């Protein structure tokens, strides 16, 4: 079994921001045990900024990016040094990977990363992954390690993603407000209600709240990866989950997951523009799996070239699909709303009948509201 384990800052650190070495050692022991049983394990770890905070005795995470990056630069070396020391005690070799959004959005780098991780796992090495917080600016930030872990799980076609946090799972309502709140044991399908009850920001030392974990579950759902959210301080939690024990909240994957190439289009490729479509075109895409023709496009936004990824937005302002375009933004501006047989007379040439062919288009399971 191939398992990705994500552990968050709030689990890895004390209240004062310093690393909780006891928790880290227990985590490493469990991962080493899984590896010794023949499981392939990847660790996605937060904690670099928290480690930097502890080193400087800071108790509040700074808001501005340069200070966060400076703390990450201080903390990342300390974090990996501790992991390496603990894993060495169990005879395990680690490999550090620091990633940015560009490593996922660039198709060649994405595939190369897949080959690298496959080789490390084949050699019995434990890859330790974090976002490269020191260099990531807003344009290339993944933003949170819940999403990073889901993207990695999707990339390596993992069987299971375990997200360890400081709460017991996804509750049916906010447990900080409602004393009768209960953990949802199994989620089989996605609905807007999951995002509504997921809440917002994380803790003082962390980035991802429950909302980001639901977004991660959405990626896993479409990728065919089972995901579990559980409390990282439960005794032997990783081995128990891997053995099938019901702990926390389990998100089941869809029965017919999207192909790996379409997963890349849906969740990894950089969105360079937006195509706004009428009701008929939206129905053709979502209900009937058709290609997007120019006749259904009412507006285009952004600058994009042939082969770039764009988001498709319906008449209600919801993002319903993503796909790779056959025409540039300048060309789409000229042919939007026209029939396919008019493309050549308008442009002087015709590459394709479709602006996005259905083979290069992914309908999203849940439409996010367009924010442009």
Swiss-Prot record:
PUA domain location: 272-350
Binding site for substrate: 46, 133, 145
Location in or out of the cell: Cytoplasm
Documented EC number(s): 2.7.2.11
SMART domains: PUA
Binding site for ATP: 6, 165-166, 207-213
UniProt pathway annotation: Amino-acid biosynthesis; L-proline biosynthesis; L-glutamate 5-semialdehyde from L-glutamate: step 1/2
Keyword set includes Glycosyltransferase: no
Gene Ontology BP term (one): L-proline biosynthetic process
GO cellular component assignments: cytosol
Pfam entry (one): AA_kinase
UniProt KW keywords: Amino-acid biosynthesis, ATP-binding, Cytoplasm, Kinase, Nucleotide-binding, Proline biosynthesis, Transferase
GO molecular function: ATP binding; glutamate 5-kinase activity; RNA binding
Function: Catalyzes the transfer of a phosphate group to glutamate to form L-glutamate 5-phosphate.
Family per similarity comment: Belongs to the glutamate 5-kinase family.
Name of this chain's protein: Glutamate 5-kinase
Species annotation: Caldanaerobacter subterraneus subsp. tengcongensis (strain DSM 15242 / JCM 11007 / NBRC 100824 / MB4)
Upper taxonomic lineage: Bacteria, Bacillati, Bacillota, Clostridia, Thermoanaerobacterales
Gene this protein is translated from: proB
């Amino acid at each position: 079994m191939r398992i990705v384990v994500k552990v968050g800052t709030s689990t890895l650190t004390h209240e004062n921001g310093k690393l909780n070495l006891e928790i880290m050692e227990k985590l490493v022991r469990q991962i080493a045990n899984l590896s010794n049983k023949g499981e392939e394990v990847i660790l996605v770890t937060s904690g670099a900024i928290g480690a930097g905070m502890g080193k400087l005795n800071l108790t509040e995470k700074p808001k501005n990016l340069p200070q966060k990056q400076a703390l990450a630069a201080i903390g990342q070396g300390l974090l990996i040094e501790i992991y390496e020391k603990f894993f060495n005690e169990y005879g395990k070799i680690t490999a550090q990977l620091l990633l940015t959004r560009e490593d996922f959005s660039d198709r060649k780098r994405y595939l190369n990363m897949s080959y690298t991780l496959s080789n490390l796992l084949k050699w019995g090495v434990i890859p330790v992954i974090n976002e490269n917080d020191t260099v990531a600016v807003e344009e290339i930030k993944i933003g949170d390690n819940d999403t990073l872990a889901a993207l990695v799980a999707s990339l390596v076609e993992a069987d299971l993603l375990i997200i360890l946090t400081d709460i017991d799972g996804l509750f049916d309502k906010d447990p900080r407000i409602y004393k009768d709140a209960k953990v949802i044991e199994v989620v089989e399908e996605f609905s807007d209600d999951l995002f509504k009850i997921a809440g917002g920001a994380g803790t003082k030392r962390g980035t991802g709240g429950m909302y980001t974990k639901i977004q991660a579950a959405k990626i896993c759902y479409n990728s065919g990866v089972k995901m579990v959210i559980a409390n990282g301080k439960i005794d032997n939690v990783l081995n128990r989950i891997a053995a099938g024990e019901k702990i926390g909240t389990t998100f089941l994957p869809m029965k017919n997951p999207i192909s790996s190439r379409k997963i890349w289009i849906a969740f990894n490729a950089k969105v360079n523009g937006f195509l706004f479509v009428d009701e008929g075109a939206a129905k053709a895409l979502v209900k009937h799996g058709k290609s997007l023709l120019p006749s259904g496009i009412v507006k285009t936004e952004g600058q994009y070239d042939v082969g770039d990824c764009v988001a498709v937005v319906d008449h209600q302002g919801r993002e319903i699909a993503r796909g790779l375009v056959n025409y540039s933004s300048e060309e789409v501006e000229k042919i939007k709303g026209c029939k396919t047989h008019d493309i050549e007379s308008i442009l002087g040439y015709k590459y394709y009948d479709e602006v996005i062919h259905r083979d290069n288009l992914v309908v999203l399971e849940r439409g996010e509201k367009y924010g442009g």
